[in-house]
Amino acid sequence: MALDNDFSGKVALVTGGSRGLGRAMALALAQRGADLVITSRKIDSCESVALEIEAIGRRALPYGCHVGKWDEIEGLVNAAYDRYGKIDILINNAGMSPLYDKLSNVTEELFDKVVGVNLKGPFRLMSLVGERMVEGDGGSIINISSTASLNPSPEAEPYGAAKSGLNALTRSFAFALGPKVRVNAIAAGPFLTDISKAWDMEAFEKRAQSTLALGRGGQPEEIVGAALYLAGPGGSFTTGTVIRVDGGTR
């Protein structure tokens, strides 16, 4: 079996694909021959990434979508299949982890938003796309989880709980959609993306020396290797699992 990560003829849908980890994975797939559906709430940002992909010589469909809203998800899936006729790779990357000062100040609205984007949306996307993958030639689904799902902290309780649920969905969908569809998750550690610009970087870098084996945060491109492995033929016997890409987070 060839393990060269050639994705020519494949179609990938990446949520949260307009920046950060999503953009890095989308561009990497395009560079290896895949056509893309790029979606996030900000259509302008999706269009910018689509232009980058088209400059590589691949096709791209930018689509504005709030993945916490099922009616918008259904529109996204229909648009993707209308354009390409299939989806081979689904990457549930969109997420949100808003800050709060104490647990009692987490509102019902905030809690529901976190669960909607990190858990409810991926469930619906996996249901809709996975069913079509089973009816077609199969595929690979990759859920971007978080080390917060494995080592939850008081600063990210709703987020950690939602991502823990995503890990559970990863396992159950692997059985529900197998053997034609593989479903895996990547537990991402602290990556330096647009979101990290709000961090106290001096405090983070100091803390990283004792909490991360590599002593630093990750660059978006450093998640690409794991994503390509899970999406491609190299991961053909890997399903229902969570792979940590976290710099050795304690």
Model-flagged regions — what are they?
Residues M126, A162, T170:
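Active-site helix of classical SDR
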Residues Y84, F123, G217-V245:
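C-terminal substrate-recognition "lid" of short-chain dehydrogenase/reductases
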Residues D101-L103, T107-D112, S196, A208:
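Substrate-binding pocket helix/loop in short-chain dehydrogenase/reductase
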Residues S146:
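Residue(s) in the substrate-gating loop at a strand-loop-helix junction
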Residues V11, S18-G20:
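Conserved glycine-rich cofactor-binding loop
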Residues E131, A174-P179, S236:
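Alpha-helical segment proximal to the catalytic Tyr-Lys
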Residues A2-D4, S97-Y100, N151, S210, ...:
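Short C-terminal tail/terminal secondary-structure segment
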